[in-house]
Amino acid sequence: MAVCIAVIAKENYPLYIRSVPVQNELKFHYTVHTSLDVVEEKISAVGKAMADQRELYLGLLYPTEDYKVYGYVTNSKVKFVIVVDSSNTSLRDNEIRSMFRKLHNSFTDVMCNPFYNPGDTIQSKAFDSMVSAMMVQAS
């Protein structure tokens, strides 16, 4: 499904980023970083419209020739970015939402860990295995 999953802190530095294949990691760092401008733009546009009923799922941030970049923002302004392969046309919007819900729930579990310092990079085996389940298997 996903080729890159990233968790970005409120201050826009990566808390977690994972991509397959590993050779493209720098390319995906760039893709995730450039998507943050679109995320900020959507947050400010939605914030002006309805501050109370803000949708956490931002939808498709932007498509590229090879990938589609989707975004999600938590109430604490932590951003999740999922990059999927454009050739995967069977992937529906509700499946992307489901992936973000799983990611958010797993992130909440990490935050509830008393040994995790908020703002540190995420180094949880449970979080990593959940992300691995969402990633496409490199063949």
From Swiss-Prot:
Compartments in which it is found: Cytoplasm, Perinuclear region; Endoplasmic reticulum; Golgi apparatus
InterPro entries named in the record: Longin-like_dom_sf, Sedlin, TRAPPC2L
Keyword vocabulary terms for this entry: Cytoplasm, Endoplasmic reticulum, ER-Golgi transport, Golgi apparatus, Transport
Primary location class: cytoplasm
Pfam families: Sedlin_N (PF04628)
A GO term from the CC aspect: Golgi apparatus
GO BP, sorted A to Z: endoplasmic reticulum to Golgi vesicle-mediated transport
CDD domains noted in UniProt: TRAPPC2L
Protein task: May play a role in vesicular transport from endoplasmic reticulum to Golgi.
Family indicated by similarity: Belongs to the TRAPP small subunits family. Sedlin subfamily.
Record protein name field: Trafficking protein particle complex subunit 2-like protein
Source organism (scientific name): Salmo salar
